[in-house]
Amino acid sequence: MALQSLPCRHGSPTIRLTADTPIVPDSERLPLKRDEPGSRSMRSTFIPSSQCSNLSSATASSSRRRSCRRYQHGEAVASSSTRWRTKWNLFIICLLLLCLPGLAVRYMHDMFSPCISGVANSQHSSSQSPRSHCRSLVPSFIAIYSASVVLCALISCFLDPYETTLPLTNVTNCLTLFRSSGSLRSEHRCSTSDSRRSRQQLSITSRGSA
């Protein structure tokens, strides 16, 4: 059978057609339907094979940008109100994290105070063991921890439960979208390899038939 090669648009690879393949001219094609009277008409566009690889990555990057950035029109008030709430949350976390360093500084000060004050004071404090120091620090630790818990409870009473969460949702969304984009890229690689194999098989069969 005779083969006819027709070049495609935008520099895509040629398509081989047989003599029996009907070719419909542009004048006999049906007009395209429109969605709405005020919208643009749906036109058929030819996407080359070289741009298919960039399509999935572009859609994934645009979705990551939309998920990571804040909305400017619909939720502008909500985004501005959550800023000071996240500041309160960070303040609470810093308060909880600063309890242990404060206790450690106090313990180290009690241990190294003999070296600073002198020998007489060191003889007085030598009778105290490290266990006694730890026992003296336990009530202060309990008092600081209970005060921080009460402060967290008071602040959480004035906040919404949805807005008291830390701003980690955007990070998790970005990670999930990044993983999905990686899966899309792997699927596209598999599809391109399958298309290459099918093209090779078609070329082999066309050569054998010729």
Curated annotation (Swiss-Prot):
Its EC number is 3.1.1.74. Transmembrane segments: none annotated. This is Putative cutinase. It catalyses: cutin + H2O = cutin monomers. Residues 26-58 are annotated as: Disordered. GO terms for molecular function: cutinase activity. Keywords: Hydrolase, Serine esterase. It comes from Phytophthora capsici. Residues 49-58 have a biased composition (Low complexity). Residues 26-38 have a biased composition (Basic and acidic residues).
